[in-house]
Amino acid sequence: MANKLFLVCATLALCFLLTNASIYRTVVEFEEDDASNPVGPRQRCQKEFQQSQHLRACQRWMSKQMRQGRGGGPSLDDEFDFEGPQQGYQLLQQCCNELRQEEPVCVCPTLKQAARAVSLQGQHGPFQSRKIYQSAKYLPNICKIQQVGECPFQTTIPFFPPYY
């Protein structure tokens, strides 16, 4: 009986050690990849943003959403007031194509940079800037980029003080 109990305990201990070692190995490999990569994730996303011509179609789409008073949650079927529905759809499709060319890890950071660029271009107030960020937040969902979903950044703008 003692031998069986010892065998069960030894098996459990071995399983625990193997599990612990594989978790440690995975973490170490991940950290080594980041350490050996001279360009960190932030710089890589910044570079992608610049190479993708600053997500021009997405910036134009966000700007139009803000001017039309739309926040988040639009769909590919939305109509645009001052353009025909087909032209608005094409602009959104171009934006989605730009986003699909990004690495999944860079989609939200580059969208945030694009939203900031749109906010700064027109010198919009806090309300309009909030709408721009809100539109950007939902673009991965609208474009059905499944690896990303919704961007986690806030729809409040850090360079505008909150109202109390």
From Swiss-Prot:
Xref: CDD domains: AAI_SS (cd00261)
Maturation propeptide residues: 22-37, 73-81
Keywords: Disulfide bond, Seed storage protein, Signal, Storage protein
Segment forming the signal sequence: 1-21
DNA-binding found in the keyword field: no
TM annotation in the entry: none
Molecular-function GO terms, alphabetical: nutrient reservoir activity; protein histidine kinase binding
Protein family according to the UniProt entry: Belongs to the 2S seed storage albumins family.
Assembly, per entry: The mature protein consists of a small and a large chain linked by disulfide bonds. Interacts with AHK2.
Annotated function: This is a 2S seed storage protein.
Protein name (database record): 2S seed storage protein 3
Source organism: Arabidopsis thaliana (Mouse-ear cress)
Gene: AT2S3
